[in-house]
Each structure stands twice: as C-alpha cells, then as structure tokens.
C-alpha cells in the first residue's frame, strides 16, 4: 500500500491506494497530521509523505470518518463553505450530527436526573408530586406571566370573581345610586320622562350597562383565547409522559429504592437466621423514581423523535 499526503494550510488530503487500484480520499484537520520539517520542499508550501506496506493491503475503514471537532458553523459570524463537499462526505456529516444530537439529549436527561436527586429534600409518599418540571405555556394575554396548571386555576377564579362583581355592581348597586346625567343634575328617570319614553327604560342606566357589558365581554373573550391557547399547547405535548419528559420507573415502582436480596446458600439444618433483605438505590433510575420517556426523549414534545421532520425536512 502506498499513501501520499498533500498538506494545505487548513486541511490535509490522504490518498490511499492498494494493489487493486481502489482509491479513497480522507480529510483530516491540520492538527491531526503534522509532517516532519525534513519532508517539506523549499519552493512550495506543500509537503509530500509517502509510505509503502506490501503486507497490509486492507481497505480503508468505512464509517464515520468525521473528526469530533469538525464544525461547519463555528459561530454567529463564522460559517465554513461546505459547497465543495462530496456526497459521501455530506452523508457522513449528517449521520455524525444526528448521533451528536441524541447523545446531547441523553446527557441532558442524566443531568436532570442528578439535579432532581440533589434538589428534592422531602417527598411525601402519600401525596403526588407537583408537576414542577411541566413546561410553562406562553400566555396569549399581554402583560401576563407564563401559564402553568396552577396559575391557570388562579386565572379562572380571578375572572369569575371579576365578572360576578361587575354584574352585581351594574345590576344592583348602580340603579340604587340614582346616577346623575347632564349639567342640570337631572336624574336618568327625569330624563326619560322629559322625552316621553316608557318608564321601564329608567330602571337600567345605559352608561353603566354599556360599561358592565363591555367589561364582561372583554374578560370572557380573553379567557376563551387563553383556554384555546392552552389546548393548542397540550396537543404538542407527548401523549405518554404528558409533557414532563419522564415516566415512572417500573423496576422500583417509582420509589427510587429496590430490595437487595442475596441468594441463600446455608444448609437446611443450620440454626442461623436468614439474612434480612436490605434496600438500595435503584440502578435503573439512579434513585430518582423516573426514567426517560422513549417517545419524546426527555423533551416533552410530541415531535421530538428520530423521525422528526426538523431532522429530515426532505424525506
């Protein structure tokens, strides 16, 4: 086997040739291949490295040949030109980055498990844990914080209280106050009498009625918009973990500990007591009581899977 290497200031190309005249081109960054100064030509910036091995004529390794530190987009202002890449090289880069995405998601899952172990201090086994890891929903109402299941109930209570107060004020309090209209201090009833209109109209003040009806309509509309927003966000959540990203551990029944029972090897005629079973931390969930949801990969979103269209937009 004979191999030649031509070094450029940014990348090295290694050409492998075998007796079967099969050739393959591998790319390495400049830090992977440093030629000896004695091999450099004085009149050119390129270096030539040749080696021969007649006993080993194995084909070049097939698979992911992309270096770990290879990055097309290094920053917000630095983007390498990948138009010159060959088809096989593009496929290798896509496969490498897909694997990197799921490895990073697995790292996030393990970090969140450790965070849960160190942050939880006291757990009441009789009552269920609050969904603190439930992702917050952006509110559609301006100047309101993100919506959670707890704040949504508070929003319902506040809206019902406001609507009830407005109706009570417009229907009972305002008619008894004898609100005045105009500059002459004429009451609304006198104003109706002067126009020779039915006296039933004087029982309802149009100003109070319009303000009360408008306020009730605005509050009801905002509540309907918020409820619709919550329903739309719930459709985007994972159907298995309900947006938490975790499922109860089946090995320890979501308790975080499991029994450690060693096999008994004592003879039957012995008078020694049997060893009492002890508990230990569950190795499956690391004591957290929850494991990663395999459907959403700990993200809580229904589209986060291996077949996510964001990963393969042209398939």
Curated annotation (Swiss-Prot):
Transit peptide: 1-16
Zinc-finger ranges (CR-type): 225-307
Positions annotated as CXXCXGXG motif repeat: 238-245, 282-289
Claim: Repeat is one of the keywords in the record: yes
GO CC, alphabetical: chloroplast membrane
GO biological process terms, semicolon-separated: positive regulation of carotenoid biosynthetic process; protein stabilization
Membrane-spanning parts: 155-175, 207-227
UniProt keyword list: Chloroplast, Membrane, Metal-binding, Plastid, Repeat, Transit peptide, Transmembrane, Transmembrane helix, Zinc, Zinc-finger
CXXCXXXG motif repeat ranges, renumbered to this chain: 249-256, 293-300
GO molecular function terms attached to this record: zinc ion binding
Quaternary structure annotation from Swiss-Prot or TrEMBL: Interacts with PSY1.
PANTHER family: PLASTID TRANSCRIPTIONALLY ACTIVE PROTEIN, PROTEIN ORANGE-LIKE, CHLOROPLASTIC
Protein family membership: Belongs to the orange-like family.
Role: May be associated with accumulation of carotenoids in chromoplasts.
The protein's name in its UniProt record: Protein ORANGE-LIKE, chloroplastic
The gene coding this protein: ORLIKE
